[in-house]
């Protein structure tokens, strides 16, 4: 998607943060509802599709991209985790590439 290539890094990060939040919120709700009406079933199916889209997008990334997406958006326990691995410029380049790749796969479904 050429549109993402021209998007600011800040905007890309915001999109990823929203997706990660939605992913964890939906995972937390998984299995907690009752299937007592069709509206609830539609909501559950929508949530399961969202979870699957996130997981599929992650699996499409190469190992370095997965490392960045995982550490920056899904398991943020280690601030500055990248400092021993990359220069700041290399990290910023890889982060942008990883986010764009993830979002391209996520939005193509």
List PLM regions with ranges.
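N-terminal interaction/assembly modules
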Residues: 1-60
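Long, hydrophobic, amphipathic alpha-helical segments used as structural scaffolds
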Residues: 27, 65, 106-109
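Alpha-helix C-terminal capping segments
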Residues: 29-30, 69, 81-85
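Non-catalytic, well-ordered alpha-helical scaffold segments
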Residues: 48, 52, 66-67, 96
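Short amphipathic alpha helix immediately N-terminal
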Residues: 60-76
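Helix-turn-helix DNA-binding module
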Residues: 75-90
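DNA major-groove recognition helices of helix-turn-helix
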Residues: 91-109
């Amino acid at each position: 998607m050429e549109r993402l290539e021209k998007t600011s890094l800040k905007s890309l990060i915001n999109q990823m943060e929203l997706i990660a939040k939605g992913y964890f919120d939906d995972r937390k709700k998984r299995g907690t509802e009752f299937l007592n009406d069709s509206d609830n079933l539609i909501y559950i199916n929508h949530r399961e599709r969202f979870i699957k889209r996130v997981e599929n997008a992650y699996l499409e990334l190469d190992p370095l991209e997965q490392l960045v997406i995982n550490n920056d958006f899904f398991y943020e326990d280690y601030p500055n985790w990248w400092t021993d691995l990359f220069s700041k410029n290399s990290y910023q380049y890889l982060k942008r590439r990883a986010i764009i790749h993830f979002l391209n796969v996520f939005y193509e479904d």
